[in-house]
Amino acid sequence: MKTQIYKGSSKILYSAEEDFLLIMAFSDNGILESGEIIEVSGKGVLNNNISSFLMDKLEMIGIENHFIEKINMREQLIQYVEVFPVQVIISSVACGRFVKEFGMDEGYVFDKPIIDFKVRSREFKYPIVNEYQILNFSWLTLDEIKAVKEQALRIYAFLSGLFMGVGIRLVECKLEFGRVLNGEESIIMLTDEISPDNCRLWHIHSNEKLGFELLENKPNKAFESYQLIADRLKEK
């Protein structure tokens, strides 16, 4: 019998039969900016399919990640990873905090993608943290920060091209990384998920928002957009 290890707003982690493996289950829950959790029936199944597909694609281009295989409609088998206490946010277009905090026009295209680090803490509302703080807190080494940034930009470039090929614009995405020990060395590994829950996705021509951004204002249309993204990725 599997044992629950962790329960988040949209995913649950369980123990697996083998050491250093876990089962990650996707729920239908979505979290709003207010902290309220709402249910979007079927979202978990779609996110499992989308994330499995994208992690497989990233593996093909040499991006180490925790995904091993999809077990069923909602669950996947993953590698245990010592997750870093920071999220990596890559943005190529002004959205979210750039509009709220800097007064930028939504949709303004940056010359180059911007990388932000945020503390993985809902309690403290995911504050921005800089590289000097990360080093002083001993969360990552200088080499690890460099490797994470390089991988994050490579992942973002690949995903941007993939989504553009199906008429969807990747505006921003949130990535999580960690380390896996390999003898005396450690490997930097992509973890968590890549889905409409942690990617800002817009229609390429109309800039109509898709995925999690609809949970706030148009929750009745959220499932349709998740389904649209999944269907378009099937074409790849």
From Swiss-Prot:
SUPFAM superfamilies: SAICAR synthase-like (SSF56104). GO terms for molecular function: ATP binding; phosphoribosylaminoimidazolesuccinocarboxamide synthase activity. Its EC number is 6.3.2.6. Coiled coil: none annotated. It catalyses: 5-amino-1-(5-phospho-D-ribosyl)imidazole-4-carboxylate + L-aspartate + ATP = (2S)-2-[5-amino-1-(5-phospho-beta-D-ribosyl)imidazole-4-carboxamido]succinate + ADP + phosphate + 2 H(+). Keywords: ATP-binding, Ligase, Nucleotide-binding, Purine biosynthesis. Pathway: Purine metabolism; IMP biosynthesis via de novo pathway; 5-amino-1-(5-phospho-D-ribosyl)imidazole-4-carboxamide from 5-amino-1-(5-phospho-D-ribosyl)imidazole-4-carboxylate: step 1/2. InterPro entries: SAICAR_synt/ADE2_N, SAICAR_synt_PurC, SAICAR_synthetase. Gene3D superfamilies: ATP-grasp fold, B domain (3.30.470.20), Phosphorylase Kinase, domain 1 (3.30.200.20). CDD domains: SAICAR_synt_PurC (cd01415). One of its GO terms (cellular component) is cytosol. One of its GO terms (biological process) is cobalamin biosynthetic process. Signal peptide: none annotated. Belongs to the SAICAR synthetase family. This is Phosphoribosylaminoimidazole-succinocarboxamide synthase. The lineage of its organism: Bacteria, Pseudomonadati, Pseudomonadota, Alphaproteobacteria, Rickettsiales. The gene is purC.
